[in-house]
Amino acid sequence: MSQAGSGHAAGASYRGEFPVAFGRYLLLKRLSRGGMGEIFLAKVGEIQGFEKFVIIKKILPQLAANDDFITRFIDEAQVAIKLNHVNIAQVFEVGRVDGEYFLAIEYVDGRDVRRLLRRCRESGTRLPVDLCLLIARDLAAGLAYAHRRTVAKGQALALVHCDISPPNVMVSYEGEVKIIDFGIARSALRTADSNPNIGFGKFGYMAPEQ
């Protein structure tokens, strides 16, 4: 896990002052904020023309002192960083900057399915059948890969994404379908305790396997 100093004033990113240096990344804007963390659009690369856009998923500083939460965050990273499939947004790095843990994730230039469905409702139309079939096919391919993926000594990840819901499925402007956010998932490699009687995800989209 990489560690670095950010070189920016403490709390600057939370005041909406962008761009903001964060380790070797430059945060361009905040995309969302929840009770556990924030999502930023960022770029990496110092040479003009060789910059790359990424997504930075950063947990809130006050949660860094919660050992159980950090263990689960690292579990997520250890699982997600092993996945390399065309239909899964790739995790490039897990690290810590000035005590703030983060993931650097592939940026998908497109729209999530929730936004596509909302646009269809507003316009009184439906998603084309061929697009629905494409999304379903590619989702199945990505999930099957994650479930059968093996690591050292042939151990299977046996990974189940517990929240395959419209916000967690991206469709790029080039027609690629990508699964994002394996943060709510069950894997054979997780070390943090989990209660088998507790289900994770959105009720209408919970994985039946859990």
Name what the model sees in each region.
Residues 2-210:
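Conserved ATP-binding/catalytic core of the eukaryotic-like protein kinase fold
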